[in-house]
From Swiss-Prot:
Residues engaged in binding Mg(2+): 525, 531
Domain KH residues, every copy: 591-650
UniProt EC number: 2.7.7.8
Species of the source: Tropheryma whipplei (strain TW08/27) (Whipple's bacillus)
Compartments, record wording: Cytoplasm
Coiled coil: none
Name of the encoding gene: pnp
Protein name listed in UniProt: Polyribonucleotide nucleotidyltransferase
Signal among keywords: no
Length: 735
């Protein structure tokens, strides 16, 4: 067994120890590493590779899985079979965090299946394992001998009291303004020195950020602060990469060199380039003075079809073999990519004719779906998102059964991406990893501006339906959700908007140029060097996601991208606030929730034996009631009078009014006797309505039985006429 370890120094916040071991567990896998965080959090990562290339596969078949084991936290699964089932949302999000920096680090053309499995064997209370998992996956891949440009270091940072703290615990986040996860690797720059290439960033303002900023004077997570955080991460990433390299240096690695299958041959590329390059340059260079010109895209489709016909003829004539037909789409895309990038770098227009900082036409509308609690449509160019808000009692908040320290959340954001959004036919069913990731990004963008539980005691479910997609439906979801939440009457602390930025880099006349693009389309995302999504208020950033294909983004380029993103965000916020600038009245179909505080010792009395009391209140009023451990009672109903009636009944139980002579009550008949009826005035207080008084209710006529006038369960207005020495109550009917 070999091991390597290092220390992450957080100054006054203490240290964290990272340790990697190999050669003890999972020895059959091509690469396996056990990663430790402070000795108690333990992950096993294995990297395996298929012996043969996957047939009919034109992409790199990499699979990343995270297996959460309940025993890691000393739990038995709560499912019927007491066994782990499908991955939790948190595990899926961890898979995406690992996959995003790992995938581009393999050699292009690799077609052997590669599977990385990270198993959580042990986790200390209050710890997060995602950042450690990035390092574990990188280390197991590094020692597997596969062609890999790692190692990759991943670190989670929290901005606490102005300091970026690495690998924070859950309790640390209560004082944090921003939560940042960064992955990167060491590379040799043009000057021959080692530097850190940032590959992936995932970030969010925390739930308490608003209060920390506005009530405690904490630093706002604006563009400058985010840049500082990313720079701070580089120090920790270098340390993590050094630990992995030290481990690999202690091993006698047998490097595996699977065959590489390039997407196209040089001869196919040259032939296709000769067919289409000049025509594509005419189309895209011609967009320079044409403004927004989506017709350029259809023109390029015509060029592609003509070129395919010509290439097909060349195959039939024997110039290329039949298998070369599958290379045509990749070769065409490579030529198109080169033309489009060159046009942008040389100062010509983008693919659709826009300027570098232009946003596509915007449109927004609220209250578009009847009966729902809130709804809105947001459109940016061809990207269209429907947002729908549903409100309910807090007892409907999501309970999280995973290894994450977070056990529940009251704001739930779901994102759907049906195949018709891109004009295609496809599978419809449970959400894919991409949909889960997009929904979580939009959720994190909005959580910092949601009202507190005390100010707005509702569980909130937000659904984003991507109705049309051509670039950044996730940021469209943020905008649609802001509108929908306000339409539902949710008092957001501030509106939030999002925008996707892109980057194209390359040499022009020997000089390296970087050009940032605002509001990238789907094609620009595929052909560019960066996908950079930024969401926030007019004041600060609430969520950020960055993926890049470059070996590092210069600081001034990142700063420029953040500045352009802010300008675009403010422009979109202006459109949103023109549509709706304050919360609407809540829908008549939404529940009205009232909060009542009762003494903790009265909780059992309110619930009653086997829930008898609380169930009777719910049955009688139609309201829903939930009770918190601290004595907070939430009462909700879509009808205001039902809530008021339930509140009165709760108060009558926990804060009963002592009956006195002359006080009136709307009582309930609980028992009939030959001499009269017993009426319940308040819980535990009954009085007797004598038969002589009951006769007065029917003008004094003779009664064989009181059942002729009153029945059990009937409501009757009575007044206390006398209280005898034993405390017995005598009642009279009030007409």
């Amino acid at each position: 067994m070999q091991f390597s370890e290092g220390v992450i120094d957080n100054g006054r916040f203490g240290t964290r120890t990272i340790r990697f071991e190999t050669g003890r567990l999972a020895r059959q896998a091509q690469g396996s590493v056990v990663a430790y965080l402070d000795g108690e959090t333990m992950l096993l990562s294995s990297t395996s590779v298929g012996k043969q290339p996957k047939e009919d596969c034109d992409f790199f078949p990499l699979t990343v899985d995270v297996e959460e084991r309940s025993y890691a936290a000393g739990k038995i699964p709560g499912s019927y079979f007491r066994r782990e089932g499908r991955p939790s949302t948190e595990a899926i999000l961890a898979c995406r965090l690992i996959d995003r920096p790992l995938r581009p680090s393999f050699n292009a053309g690799l077609r052997n299946e590669v599977q990385v499995i990270v198993t959580v064997l042990s986790i200390a209370p209050g710890e997060f394992y995602e950042a450690l998992a990035i390092n574990a996956a990188s280390a197991s891949t590094l020692v597997s001998g596969l062609p890999f440009s790692g190692p990759i270091g991943g670190v989670r940072l929290a901005l606490i009291d102005g300091q970026w703290v690495a690998f924070p615990r859950y309790e640390d986040l209560s004082g944090a303004v921003f939560d940042l996860t960064v992955a990167g690797r060491v590379f040799v720059n043009e000057s021959g020195k080692e530097d850190i290439a940032i590959m992936m960033v995932e970030a969010e303002a925390t739930e308490p950020a608003w209060d920390l900023i506005h009530s405690h004077g904490a630093k706002k997570p604006n563009e400058e602060v985010i840049e500082e955080g990313i720079e701070s991460a580089k120090v920790f990433i270098r340390t993590l990469c050094d630990i992995q390299r030290d481990l690999a240096s202690k091993l006698s690695l047998s490097h595996t060199e699977p065959d590489l299958y390039p997407d196209y041959s040089d001869s196919v590329h040259s032939f296709v380039e000769g067919l289409v390059k000049s025509d594509l340059e005419k189309v895209y260079r011609g967009n320079h003075d044409s403004g927004y010109a989506p017709n350029a895209l259809s023109a390029s489709d015509e060029i592609k079809q003509k070129a395919y016909d010509a290439f097909h003829d060349a195959v039939l004539s024997g110039r290329f073999d039949q298998d070369s037909l599958s290379q045509f789409p990749h070769a065409y895309k490579a030529v198109l990519k080169d033309v489009v990038r060159t046009c942008v770098l040389e100062g010509f227009a983008r693919m659709d004719g826009r300027g570098l900082s232009d946003i596509r036409p915007l449109d927004a509308e609220v209250q578009v779906v009847p009966r729902v609690h809130g709804s809105a449509v947001f459109q940016r160019g061809e990207t269209q998102v429907l947002g729908v808000t549903t409100l309910n009692m807090l007892k409907m908040e999501q309970q999280i059964d995973s290894l994450a320290p977070i056990v529940s959340k009251r704001y739930i954001h779901h994102y759907n991406f049906p195949p018709y959004s891109t004009g295609e036919v496809g599978r419809v069913g449970s959400p894919k990893r991409r949909e889960i990731g997009h929904g979580f990004l939009a959720e994190r963008a909005l959580v910092p501006v949601l009202p507190s539980r005390e100010d707005f005691p509702y569980a909130i479910r937000q659904v984003s339906e991507a109705l049309g997609s051509n670039g950044s439906t996730s940021m469209g979801s943020v905008c649609a959700s802001t509108l929908s939440l306000l339409n539902a009457g949710v008092p957001l602390r501030a509106p939030v908007a999002g925008i996707a930025m892109g980057l194209i880099s390359g040499r022009v006349d020997g000089e390296m140029r970087y050009v940032t693009l605002t509001d990238i389309s789907g094609s620009e995302d595929a052909l560019g060097d960066m996908d950079f999504k930024v969401a926030g208020t007019s004041d600060f950033i609430t969520a950020l996601q960055l993926d890049t294909k470059l070996d590092g983004i210069p600081a001034h380029v990142l700063s420029e991208a953040l500045a352009h993103a802010r300008s675009a965000r403010l422009a979109i916020l202006d459109v949103l606030t023109r549509v709706i600038d304050s919360p609407d009245q809540m829908s008549e179909y939404a529940p009205r929730v009232v909060r009542v505080k009762i003494p903790v010792q009265k909780i059992g009395e309110l619930i009653g034996p086997k829930g008898k009391v609380i169930n009777s209140i719910q049955d009688e009023t139609g309201a829903e009631i939930s009770i918190e451990d601290d004595g907070t009672v939430y009462i909700g109903s879509s009808q205001a009078d039902s809530s008021e009636k339930a509140v009165a009944m709760v108060n009558s139980i926990v804060n009963p009014v002592e009956p006195c002579v002359g006080s009136q009550f709307l009582g309930t008949v609980v028992k009939n006797m030959p001499f009269g009826s017993f009426i319940s005035l308040v819980p535990g207080k009954d009085g007797l309505l004598h038969i002589s008084e009951i006769r007065k209710m029917v003008d004094g006529r003779h009664l064989e039985s009181v059942d002729e006038v009153l029945s059990v369960g009937q409501k009757v207005l009575v007044e206390v006429s006398k209280i005898d020495d034993r405390g017995k109550l005598c009642l009279v009917a009030v007409k």
